[in-house]
Amino acid sequence: MINIYWFKRDLRLEDNEPLHEASKQSEKLLLIYFLEDKLISDPHYSNFHWNFVKQSIEDINLSLGKKSILFLNCDPIEGFKKISEKYKIKSIYSHMETGIELTYLRDIDVKKYCDSNSIHWFEYEKNYVKRGLKNRKSWIKGWNEYVKSPVLKIDIKNLNILDIKHLSKIFNVLDTRTNKNKHLQPGGTSNGLKYLRSFLEVRNKSYNQNISKPLESRSSCSRLSPYLSWGNLSSRYVLSLIHI
């Protein structure tokens, strides 16, 4: 029996609540990312995005050492069914994805699949985003409490990660290698931290005078958007380093 951690737009180990909770369980933990054909063909995305994802996964794998994420090009339900032929899935852990309609409908289908197969799916809020709020009267209070709460640490040495070598025989595991492009920001937590540190230490000094200048603002702004969007960094982790 195993548990699964399903990476979505939360490609990090640090300050990752569902991963933190999954790490407390006794079962082996399979780390997985699905590169879905429906999303590949969706006009919201391009190869730039998927290369960023690959680089983010590679960055995590480097931190994990001998273990790695099972990186697949398939539909999540299809993947879970195939994994179930080899292992009994007890629970799936993930963040609630705040994406597009396609991912929302996919998650509804995954929930139905889990319910019909007695799989517990534990979803956690990402960056204190609340689904279905009727008003935001108490939201700011909760947000302040969230960002001031302790950043969750992961002890990688104690992560009971399932070795994917057996699953590699029944899946075509994707390669994370990408061509380097000096004009694009590379994905991964380690790269996000480099941009954050350079902003806090140097580039922020010209932020106010350059923010409205198209050329100068490229270097004086934080450049953290992709790292927050794809979850290489959590908003709480960033704010903890800024000490606001």
Region spans (language model):
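Glycine/tryptophan-enriched, flexible segments
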Residues: N117-I119, S138-L241
